[in-house]
């Protein structure tokens, strides 16, 4: 409990799940989610770019080894699933995997650490400090990523199959008879929309739930330490797994978009 | 869930990051990895080749060694034969030389003996004449009686 006895558990959790927001309604921006997201993206690109600049095919340094392990892992995943030629898929998968991994990792930061740091540095009262540091526990972030993937799915579907081919794919299956084409279209549209929705909601749901449990654990007093440790250890599985699933499904969806029936 | 401009901001960041990654991050790293993989593959292939070469060289060396042994044995054989031949030849020559020397010796001895005998015979003739002169106590005309003397000499 951070803000003293005046807060009930519900108020404490609600407070911690509120974003640092500027603007109103649709035009609002979550500064904490977007800020951490961009910061972590820049961390990823800075590290990888510094390795890329000095990349040698000779004996690699330790950082290059680590980066090459990640790149090799992503490259293997892409090559095992996507068989076409596309210069975008692999770097896209790398960005998704590492970026989401870093964003998910913010789940390990103790829930009260950042608000207290801000309180300590700026002197703002804790009740006014809103800081939700896990970007992937914000649906805006996960839907932003999923929307990007969705646009790519549509783009490559049309690019590879043409508008006609894409429409044909949406209408002529699973039922072959012309009278059922509208039904097909509805089914296929739902399938198509389910892809980005499931991508975004799966990631968001896992991380939001994880964050919520961390907050619940933070309200139980002194026993929170071992419980917190257990839950954090469990996230050793959840965090990379969710990043991997998002990347893998992106590759699968794009690979489906490239398949011409 | 309130969906707002954060989503658009995230989408823009996503696009920018992916483009940056595609242009400046992925190609150099994957290039270095693939280049190294090629180098390692080449190195492994080269070591395989070298091992094969070594095996071949060893086989060749063994074969050459065997051949050399056979050759050496045949050379020794030939040398032994040659030696035996030389010994035989030399022995033959020595025998011939010995016989030749013996023959010469015999011939010389024979000549010497004949000569000595001739001299002896002449001396005996002279002694016989001298004895006859003494017996007859008169001088015998050597010229008148030379035919008798010659006959005597021939009889000796």
UniProtKB/Swiss-Prot annotation, chain A:
Membrane topology: Multi-pass membrane protein
GO BP of this protein: proton motive force-driven plasma membrane ATP synthesis
Lineage per the UniProt record: Bacteria, Pseudomonadati, Pseudomonadota, Gammaproteobacteria, Alteromonadales
Keywords carried by this UniProt record: ATP synthesis, Cell inner membrane, Cell membrane, CF(0), Hydrogen ion transport, Ion transport, Membrane, Transmembrane, Transmembrane helix, Transport
Cited function: Key component of the proton channel; it plays a direct role in the translocation of protons across the membrane.
Gene3D superfamilies assigned: ATP synthase, F0 complex, subunit A
InterPro entries: ATP_syn_F0_a_bact/chloroplast, ATP_synth_F0_asu, ATP_synth_F0_asu_AS, F0_ATP_A_sf
MF terms in GO: proton-transporting ATP synthase activity, rotational mechanism
Pfam families: ATP-synt_A (PF00119)
Transmembrane segments: 28-48, 89-109, 140-160, 203-223, 229-249
Organism: Colwellia psychrerythraea (strain 34H / ATCC BAA-681) (Vibrio psychroerythus)
Family assignment from sequence similarity: Belongs to the ATPase A chain family.
Listed GO CC annotations: plasma membrane; proton-transporting ATP synthase complex
Protein name: ATP synthase subunit a
Leader sequence segment: none
Compartments reported by the entry: Cell inner membrane
Self-association and partners: F-type ATPases have 2 components, CF(1) - the catalytic core - and CF(0) - the membrane proton channel. CF(1) has five subunits: alpha(3), beta(3), gamma(1), delta(1), epsilon(1). CF(0) has three main subunits: a(1), b(2) and c(9-12). The alpha and beta chains form an alternating ring which encloses part of the gamma chain. CF(1) is attached to CF(0) by a central stalk formed by the gamma and epsilon chains, while a peripheral stalk is formed by the delta and b chains.
């Amino acid at each position: 409990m951070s803000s003293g006895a005046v807060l009930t558990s519900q108020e404490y959790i609600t407070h911690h799940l509120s974003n640092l927001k500027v603007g109103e309604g649709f035009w609002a921006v979550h500064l904490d989610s977007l800020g951490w997201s961009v910061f972590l993206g820049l961390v990823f690109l800075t590290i990888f770019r510094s390795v890329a600049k000095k990349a040698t095919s000779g004996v690699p340094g330790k950082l290059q080894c680590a980066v090459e392990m990640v790149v090799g892992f992503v490259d293997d995943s892409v090559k095992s699933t996507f068989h076409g030629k596309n210069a975008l898929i692999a770097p896209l998968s790398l960005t998704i995997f590492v970026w989401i991994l870093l964003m998910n990792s913010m789940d390990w930061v103790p829930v009260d650490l950042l608000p207290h740091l801000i309180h300590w540095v700026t002197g703002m009262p804790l009740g006014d400090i809103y800081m939700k540091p896990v970007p992937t526990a914000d649906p805006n972030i996960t839907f932003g990523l999923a929307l990007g993937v969705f646009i790519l799915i549509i783009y490559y579907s049309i690019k590879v199959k043409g508008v006609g081919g894409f429409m044909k794919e949406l209408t002529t299956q699973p039922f072959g008879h012309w009278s059922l084409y509208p039904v097909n279209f509805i089914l296929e549209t739902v399938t198509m929309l389910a892809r980005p929705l499931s991508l975004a909601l799966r990631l968001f749901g896992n991380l939001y739930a994880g964050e919520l449990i961390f907050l619940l654990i933070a309200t139980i007093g002194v026993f929170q330490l071992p419980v917190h440790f257990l839950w954090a250890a469990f996230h050793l599985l959840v965090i990379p797994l969710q990043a991997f699933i998002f990347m893998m499904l992106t590759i699968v969806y794009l690979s489906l978009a490239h398949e011409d029936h | 869930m309130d969906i707002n401009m954060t989503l658009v901001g995230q989408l823009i960041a996503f696009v920018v990051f992916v483009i940056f990654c595609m242009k400046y991050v992925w190609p150099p790293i994957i290039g270095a990895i693939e280049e190294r993989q090629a180098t390692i593959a080449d190195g492994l292939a080269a070591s395989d080749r070298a091992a094969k070469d070594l095996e071949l060289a060893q086989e060749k060396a063994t074969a050459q060694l065997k051949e050399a042994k056979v050759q050496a044995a045949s050379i020794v054989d030939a040398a032994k034969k040659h030696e035996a031949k030389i010994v035989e030849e030399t022995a033959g020559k020595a025998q011939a030389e010995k016989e030749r020397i013996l023959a010469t010796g015999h011939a010389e001895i024979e000549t010497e003996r004949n000569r000595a005998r001739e001299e002896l015979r002449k001396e005996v003739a002279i002694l016989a004449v001298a004895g006859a002169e003494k017996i007859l106590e008169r001088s015998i005309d050597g010229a008148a009686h030379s035919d008798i003397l010659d006959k005597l000499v021939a009889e000796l």
